[in-house]
């Protein structure tokens, strides 16, 4: 059967709406909900932040037990009108109208055995702001029974037991929502959809087949399902929540704020605890599947729009997306024997790898049909085969699937034993990951918004990283890839001119903290403890106390996996709707396994082709689609189309700035989220006045590592052939010492040639022992710059650019200008004793790891350069 003719239902699409199309009203955004109760009805009064407009949702309590009836008339009320409505309800009801609770979000309804419960958000806190839209963390909830004769169930009843199991999933930890921004989709998806509205092409779906919220990441989809059959404005009233991690930091660059936002979205399809959820289910959903998005914003303008008639056209927004997930095979680990490393078993050997095919087809669908890069970090050599069992099977899977894919769409697979590399001397882990990161970001690209489709850069493809647990090793690998992507994003925004970011700089330190917090959160959700191995482990800069910390976290993880995970898995299955109570069927606590809750088998299911295993629509390039349908046809975004298709009268839109500056209350600047955000400024508090001006891109701990990484990644830098796919086989996965020496020798020859040319130009200089003073205003020589840690070749390039002769043969002005510049001004006093103490180059002995000092340059030339460095008119940062 041709897969193109099949209904594509994997991992995306509109939420289950029982045939009714949901619509979202843009008149105003509700942010406050008050629940009133009478004998026969419940009324939810929703209002905007300013409390100037209101709506009413009615719940009928007279329906038979176990049924839910929700009504809404889509009528909008002013403040005076809503007061009159409530007063009339008070008079018309015998027992009166009682105010029950006030909340700030509605999550949905759930039923166990008797009646429904309403889940309401009662407390929340802001964690990020994107385009002026607030993103919030749930801090408190309330569970409200929808009945007029509620009695607390007996402890031994199924109702009470299921209610307690439901409460075991703590919704006040790492669950997030937003009133006005779709956090279930990436920034690229959200902005491209809005641009399509501007050109009246909403028939184009990005990603393919997903037209609304991405159901894969909507954790309260089960809670919303009872309401879809009742009203068609569900998303006006109820908030979609995600489970994962969101944090935001501020990088201060010369007083300008650069926001870095990290969003991790956990899939709810095959969710669960570590040893209880491994591998893949029959629908292609893998365990511990997390999408990580890195958004970098220049906050010179807060909204997505440029001033005037712009519409989602700000070029100050960039993003980059990564993916992690368990190896897509049928495999399990039995933790019942209380061992720290249970044996790995491959339960089903599928010669056609059907679940893996579904999984990768879904990745093609969600990430624009681009190249899927697979970084497999599990062990490749073991005395007793454990992880290697999966290695062999996974490689056969990739080979089989690649056999039928078009050449340009083949899965780009790389296997590398990160655990073994970390036990060897040196920085092999960081070096390999840095080279792989360059290849990854070059292949997939980043998203950078522009005024129209033609100027917008789109990320196509995804890097999928995995180890056994997709925790420690995977998190370190994603950090290094994210670090390279961050450099590319900053370069695209015009903040820096080199996409390499130095380790131990402020911006890398704060990014390390972000990924460390993300890794800890994902590890707690899946493994029951914090990360055991962090970036400090793989960089080998751990403190003596880290070993005891690692041991404690290992013990916590072992305890959680052995005694707590089963209870947590029951709560997840109940919350997500994998289990529903039915009379006469086994109770949740009586089930020996939840395998059939996550794997639905049916004899009537259509079979996918084992050869043409992908959907042709999913592998179609988003860039090609936009170019064919919009740019080539002359239907790109213009001001006139924006005004015609999306700009209504100004009063039709609620001012989302009300989220930022709360109306009807005094707002202190010190209480604003942006004021209290984590920032690189905190690194300056304990430093001297001179160090406070240090760039956030300058390393605070100079090491040979930054020099070496610049060297080994420069040949594959992102500046070359943007969008070109670099084959993974070109990477030096296991660079031998001989190859490394040859690499250094090659670069040393280049530097030596340039230094020899520099020496020839400088030999004719005559200068005294006094420093040379050069005035920027009168000199044609540009200010020199030297960042600590750059290779010496950069110094030679800067110096040669200044003193190189032009090819036109005109040397007259060169001699006159050079001689004039070497004369110190009469009015400048020089401390001769100070300069007599300057380091003697003849006595200088380079350290073993100082690669830049191996070059042979005459001492007098180096002394001249040092004299230039100590000039008071030229401020250099040189050691």
From Swiss-Prot:
InterPro entries: Fig4-like, SAC_dom. Its EC number is 3.1.3.-. Its cofactor is Mg(2+). Residues 761-879 are annotated as: Required for vacuolar localization. One of its GO terms (molecular function) is phosphatidylinositol-3,5-bisphosphate 5-phosphatase activity. Transmembrane segments: none annotated. GO terms for cellular component: fungal-type vacuole membrane; intracellular membrane-bounded organelle; nuclear periphery; PAS complex. It is an enzyme of class 3 (hydrolase). Residues 166-528 form the SAC domain. It is found in: Vacuole membrane. Disulfide bonds: none annotated. GO terms for biological process: 1-phosphatidyl-1D-myo-inositol 3,5-bisphosphate metabolic process; phosphatidylinositol dephosphorylation; regulation of phosphatidylinositol biosynthetic process. It is a peripheral membrane protein. The modification Phosphoserine is found at residue 829. Present with 339 molecules/cell in log phase SD medium. Component of the PI(3,5)P2 regulatory complex, composed of ATG18, FIG4, FAB1, VAC14 and VAC7. VAC14 nucleates the assembly of the complex and serves as a scaffold. The PI(3,5)P2 regulatory complex regulates both the synthesis and turnover of phosphatidylinositol 3,5-bisphosphate (PtdIns(3,5)P2). Major enzyme required for hyperosmotic shock-induced turnover of PtdIns(3,5)P2 and requires VAC14 for this function. In vivo, mediates turnover of PtdIns(3,5)P2 at the vacuole membrane necessary for vacuolar size control. In vitro, catalyzes the removal of phosphate from the fifth hydroxyl of the myo-inositol ring of phosphatidylinositol 3,5-bisphosphate. This is Polyphosphoinositide phosphatase.
């Amino acid at each position: 059967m041709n897969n193109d003719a099949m209904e594509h239902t994997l991992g995306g699409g509109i939420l289950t709406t029982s045939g009714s199309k949901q619509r979202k009203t843009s008149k105003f955004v509700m942010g406050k909900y008050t629940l009133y109760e009478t004998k026969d009805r419940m009324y939810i009064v929703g209002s905007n932040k300013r409390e100037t407009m209101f709506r009413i949702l009615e719940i009928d309590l007279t329906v038979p037990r176990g049924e839910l009836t929700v009504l809404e008339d889509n009528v909008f009320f002013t403040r005076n009108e809503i007061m009159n409505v409530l007063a009339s309800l008070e008079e018309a009801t015998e027992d009166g109208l009682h105010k029950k609770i006030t909340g700030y979000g509605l999550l949905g309804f759930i039923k166990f055995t008797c009646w429904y419960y309403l889940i309401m958000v009662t407390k929340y806190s802001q964690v990020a702001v994107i385009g002026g839209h607030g993103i919030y963390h749930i801090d408190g909830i309330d569970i409200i029974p929808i009945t007029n004769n509620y009695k607390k169930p007996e402890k031994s009843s199924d109702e009470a037991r299921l209610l307690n199991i439901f409460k075991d999933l703590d919704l006040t930890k790492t669950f997030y929502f937003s009133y006005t921004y779709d956090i279930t989709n990436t920034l690229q998806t959200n902005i491209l959809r809005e641009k399509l509205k501007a050109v009246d092409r909403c028939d184009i779906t990005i990603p393919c087949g997903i037209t609304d919220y991405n159901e894969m990441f909507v954790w309260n989809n089960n809670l919303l399902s009872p309401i879809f059959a009742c009203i068609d404005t569900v998303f006006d009233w109820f908030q979609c929540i995600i489970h994962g991690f969101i944090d935001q930091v501020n990088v201060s660059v010369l007083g300008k704020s650069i926001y870095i936002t990290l969003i991790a979205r956990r899939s709810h399809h095959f969710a669960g605890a570590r040893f209880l959820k491994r591998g893949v289910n029959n629908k292609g959903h893998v365990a511990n599947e997390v999408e990580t998005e890195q958004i970098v914003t220049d906050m010179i303008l807060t909204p997505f729009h440029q001033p005037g008639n712009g519409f989602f056209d700000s070029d100050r927004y960039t993003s980059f997306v990564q993916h992690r997930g368990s190896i897509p095979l049928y495999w399990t680990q039995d933790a019942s024997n209380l061992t720290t490393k249970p044996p790995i078993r491959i339960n089903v050997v599928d010669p056609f790898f059907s679940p893996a095919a579904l999984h990768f087809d879904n990745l093609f669908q969600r990430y624009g049909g681009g190249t899927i890069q697979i970084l497999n970090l599990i062990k490749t050599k073991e005395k007793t085969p454990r992880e290697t069992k999966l290695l062999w099977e996974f490689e056969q899977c990739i080979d089989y699937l690649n056999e039928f894919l078009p050449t340009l769409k083949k899965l780009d697979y790389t296997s590398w034993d990160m655990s073994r590399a970390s036990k060897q001397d040196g920085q092999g882990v960081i070096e390999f990951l840095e080279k792989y990161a360059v290849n990854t970001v070059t292949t997939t690209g980043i998203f950078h918004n522009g005024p129209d489709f033609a100027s917008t850069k789109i990320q196509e493809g995804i890097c999928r990283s995995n180890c056994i647990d997709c925790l420690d090793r995977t998190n370190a690998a994603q950090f290094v890839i994210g670090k390279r992507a961050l450099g590319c994003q900053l370069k695209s925004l015009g903040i820096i001119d080199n996409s390499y970011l130095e380790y131990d700089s402020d911006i890398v330190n704060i990014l390390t903290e972000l990924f460390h917090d993300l890794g800890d959160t994902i590890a707690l959700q899946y493994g029951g403890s914090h990360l055991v191995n962090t970036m400090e482990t793989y960089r080998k800069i751990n403190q003596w106390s880290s070993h005891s910390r690692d041991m404690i976290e290992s013990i916590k993880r072992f305890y959680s996996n052995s005694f707590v995970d089963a209870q947590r898995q029951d709560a997840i299955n109940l919350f997500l709707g994998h289990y529903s109570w039915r009379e006469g069927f086994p109770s949740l606590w009586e089930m020996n396994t939840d395998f059939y809750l996550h794997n639905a088998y049916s004899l009537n299911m259509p079979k996918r082709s084992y050869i043409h295993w992908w959907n042709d629509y999913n592998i179609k390039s988003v860039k090609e689609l936009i170019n064919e349908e919009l740019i080539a046809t002359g239907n790109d975004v213009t001001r006139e189309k924006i005004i015609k298709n999306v700009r209504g009268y100004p009063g039709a839109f609620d001012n989302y700035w009300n989220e930022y500056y709360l109306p009807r209350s005094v707002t202190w600047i010190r209480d604003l989220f942006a004021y209290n955000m984590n920032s690189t400024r905190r690194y300056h508090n304990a430093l001297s006045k001179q160090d406070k001006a240090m760039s956030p891109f300058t390393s605070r701990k100079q090491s040979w590592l930054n020099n070496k990484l610049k060297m080994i990644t420069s040949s594959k830098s992102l500046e070359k052939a943007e969008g070109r796919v670099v084959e993974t086989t070109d990477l030096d996965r296991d660079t031998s010492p001989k190859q490394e020496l040859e690499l250094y020798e090659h670069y040393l020859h280049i530097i030596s040639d340039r230094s020899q040319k520099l020496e020839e130009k400088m030999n004719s200089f005559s200068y005294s022992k006094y420093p040379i003073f050069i005035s920027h205003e009168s000199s044609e020589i540009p200010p020199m710059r030297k960042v600590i840690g750059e290779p010496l070749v950069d110094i030679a390039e800067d110096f040669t650019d200044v003193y190189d002769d032009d090819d036109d043969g005109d040397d007259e002005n060169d001699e006159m200008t050079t001689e004039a510049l070497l004369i110190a001004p009469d009015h400048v006093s020089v401390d001769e004793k100070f300069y007599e103490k300057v380091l003697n180059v003849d006595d200088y002995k380079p350290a073993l790891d100082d690669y830049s000092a191996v070059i042979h340059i005459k001492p007098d030339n180096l002394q001249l350069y040092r004299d230039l460095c100590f000039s008071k008119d030229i401020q250099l940062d040189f050691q």
